[in-house]
Amino acid sequence: MAKDIKFSADARESMVRGVDILADTVKVTLGPKGRNVVLEKAFGSPLITNDGVTIAKEIELEDHFENMGAKLVSEVASKTNDIAGDGTTTATVLTQAIVREGLKNVTAGANPIGIRRGIEAATTTAVEALKAVAQPVSGKEAIAQVASVSSRSEKVGDYISEAMERVGNDGVITIEESRGMETELEVVEGMQFDRGYLSQYMVTDNEKMVADLENPFILITDKKISNIQDILPLLEEVLKTSRPLLIIADDVDGEALPTLVLNKIRGTFNVVAVKAPGFGDRRKAMLEDIAVLTGGTVITEDLGLELKDATMAALGQAAKVTVDKDNTVIVEGAGSSEAISNRVSLIKSQLETTTSEFDREKLQERLAKLAGGVAVIKVGAATETELKEMKLRIEDALNATRAAVEEGIVAGGGTALINVMDKVAALELDGDAATGRNIVLRALEEPVRQIAYNAGYEGSVIIDKLKNSAAGIGFNAATGEWVDMIATGIIDPVKVTRSALQNAASVAGLILTTEAVVATKPEPAAPAMPQGMDPGMMGGF
């Protein structure tokens, strides 16, 4: 396929046009008085949103060279979203500012490699300065404050802080669509997996159709149980304790299932059987998680263990297990806190190395179940359009809150970026590297400038006053007042701010050092069919 190639200034300018188109579309959403962008959807109603990464992903330009520039900025937004979960609009604004200033200097004859070196050095200094002034976030009120700022809703902030308090900072908090108009929080405590009882005759509450097991033993195996003789010695030992038994196995069938059901109906002992969760290697990992949580051992041939040889020592235990037709919940497993902590660390290390989004999602689910529960924020709204917009806002708020807990917070509204300018300005560089440093200094002003502009104020005036104010004092664009940003609750997670700056500097440096751009040449349009010709005459039979 033929290619179009552009070189030097022509190549960079084409890409920068794409950068500007995307950034100008996204940056109108920045700040408390940012506007919305309406996105056409192929199916269903249009999406109204102020989420930077969602907007960036939708933009596709007709010109291939411009589109490459737009896609690079979209990549900045996506990368920032992946790392910090928020700050995508800030990252886009910073990228545009660095690229625009950098291009002026490269066009004037500066060396792009030297400029890039200066940009990298200045960015590193700014990030270190941000980390140095970060304040830790702890406690329900502080977490609620962070979430409220990001979601622009105190109610959502309260839901997120309560969810994190209930399931822990590592716990899974999912966001689902509610059937009603109200947004509500639902928490499932303990480890839950999506497997229910194998027979309805195993229930203990016929009205609710659930089986409640108090202080049960738990048999965990990846084997199929077809012959009752395989587990008979173990059943006899459990029977002596008068405690219920939960069996988690690949399957229970043959004579084994009716035998267990018959003994349950007769009242001989209380037993519930469920299928093991997951499939393949993930099933083995989840069974091991359950074993660690409950203090048991997985009966598996991989460890050279047979069901007929299993002893009471291999059984796990829990304070309570609830099983319905679809789910099993294990509450307060008897596993040691050290073993659980080690297992959590193992899963976290796997999370850091995995490249698959699906694997990442499943690992996070496993982590949450071990950490103590799953919280579900059910989003309600009057219309589907409002529901989609609110769901995106809550997702951003949740991600920002987690980032704040992880690395701390700084003054929001772009104030922290202005406050670290002195550290960057003090960086001793010369030549084109010094030019790169100055480009970053100018870019650090841009988020404040855009927030002010979106709120109807003159950005330059706000920036001048901000530079002469004490550290932490900033401009509240929502009210037009000068306030102590952190005390007022206008904050940004350090992770969000530094990720936005690092990713923006990285991609902007790449664009400035681009010397050639190769794009697919558009295919010429097919010649129009002469009018009046019958399509059936063109060789078709």
Curated annotation (Swiss-Prot):
EC number: 5.6.1.7
Keyword check for Nucleotide-binding: yes
Main subcellular location: cytoplasm
EC class of the enzyme, as a word: isomerase
Compartments it resides in: Cytoplasm
Coiled-coil features, chain-numbered ranges: none
Biological process, per Gene Ontology: protein refolding
Record's function text: Together with its co-chaperonin GroES, plays an essential role in assisting protein folding. The GroEL-GroES system forms a nano-cage that allows encapsulation of the non-native substrate proteins and provides a physical environment optimized to promote and accelerate protein folding.
Subunit structure: Forms a cylinder of 14 subunits composed of two heptameric rings stacked back-to-back. Interacts with the co-chaperonin GroES.
Family note: Belongs to the chaperonin (HSP60) family.
Name the record gives this protein: Chaperonin GroEL
Upper classification of the organism: Bacteria, Bacillati, Bacillota, Bacilli, Lactobacillales
Gene name of this polypeptide: groEL
